[in-house]
Amino acid sequence: MLHCQIATTADLSLLRMSVSRPRENIAEYTRLQHPYITPLCAQLKNTFGDLEAVRRVAAFAHEATSPLGEWCADHVWALALADDEARKIERTTERLFLAQKDARPVERLDADLDRVRQAQEFVRNWNFTPPSAIGNGMSPKVLLLKKYLDQVYEKPCDTRCIIFVKRRYTARLLGQLFAKLGSPHLRLGMLIGTRYGDAGDVKISFRQQVLTLMRFRKGEINCLFATSIAEEGLDIPDCNLIIRFDLYDTLIQYIQSRGRARHASSRYIHMIEAGNRLHIQNISDVRQGEIVMRRFCEALPADRLLQGNDCNLDAALAKEKLMGKYTDPSTGATLTYNSSLVVLAHFVGCLVCMSYPKQRRS
């Protein structure tokens, strides 16, 4: 039987002897522009804007102009209308067509699918300008990130950096942008989870994520663009730079992402917009929340500390002992009552549902 006890220290100075807290800095970028429609987005909306799947991509491309800039916003279309992703849009178009309550001729569906292919061809032939710090190519937020990365990776170094963003699209676009900008000492990677659904959303397996983390630990990758999946559970002792490109929403996100910086001389950078009171208040809230949480834990009386031995296991297992069980004679495997319910539910869920004709009432 496992016996354990949850313990912490009331004196944080003792904890800092073994676990170092990163040095925190606030990096301000100038006020962002309001979202606007780029020439590419305008032409696609005017020509194919009646297609629901295209409208969804256009909405994000329009939104991306403010935090990311025109280059990233236009490349949303390149991601969403790549060969594999265009087929995903075609399937979405078919599903939306079949969901229509009013009967429409199938020729209308064929015409919509053909227009999706036309949009794909239009984007493929578009002359994308290279990313530039001049004009609206990159937003002030991206330019500030570029400034930090240029300073860190201008020469060979052992810095391991994780850049946290909120959306998978953002991680992919920034990864493409900085790969395009090029730096001999910046080796990029991406950690965005396994969810797969929206157009342009790349499918990444669990194995690929594990390999990415292994390369990051070895130093083959020294800069990761990551979503919230990387906030919890990563133990990389050499990680010494965390950049919150998109600010956290909760105290837990703040503490967990800060905990990824394990190196003795680590930095944690909060990127905020100049004059943005919400960003300033967000930082103030999480810092105050951490103080309140620490005081609460220190104020717990002794009888509320978790010892791990205050549970009567015999009473908890009493019902289980009363239930029957079956032991397979050939393998020795035992099937208990509770586990049999899980097996039965899985079996029933796998059965093919049969539809029977409704009986007429006489």
Locations of the language-model features?
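Helicase motor interdomain insertion/brace
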Residues: 1-181
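Eukaryotic basic, amphipathic alpha-helical target segments in cytosolic regions
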Residues: 6, 153-156, 182, 190, ...
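Conserved helicase ATPase core of P-loop NTP-dependent helicases/translocases
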Residues: 160-164, 170-176, 185-227
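Eukaryotic short linear interaction motifs
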Residues: 170-173, 197-200, 232-233, 250-252, ...
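Conserved RecA-like helicase motor core of SF1/SF2 enzymes
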Residues: 193-197, 222, 228-264
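Conserved segment of the helicase C-terminal RecA-like domain
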Residues: 219, 256-289
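Long, hydrophobic alpha-helical segments
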Residues: 282-322
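N-terminal segment of the canonical double-stranded RNA-binding domain
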Residues: 309-361
